[in-house]
Amino acid sequence: MTARSRLCPLLAASVGALLLCAAEAPATAAPHSYTIVIDKLKFGPVPAQLHKGDTIMWVNKDLFRHSATAADHSFDVDLMPGKAGKTVLTKSGSIPFVCRYHPNMRGLLQVK
């Protein structure tokens, strides 16, 4: 048996092991940024595909001061008229949020 014939099975096994490891590694998506506009005493549409690590930019286009405040206190962004602020989503799950100044303004983030 030549050295080459002994190396072929070893090389094939190594490549197979690498492919198996790559197939089992979880895919992690790069974080995304989304914008939620506040206007006319309402939060704009909430993005549907939120993931842990994503950023939400809150933009207040209203004439009034607003906040985006999570019920679980995981974020609290205070926004003067015409200003913006951001939140990085640090956990998964359903996160209800409200405006502290206008409690009828509510929303729900679904974070995977």
Language-model-derived ranges and their functions:
Residues 2-11, 18-112:
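Extracytoplasmic copper-binding redox domains, predominantly the cupredoxin/blue-copper superfamily
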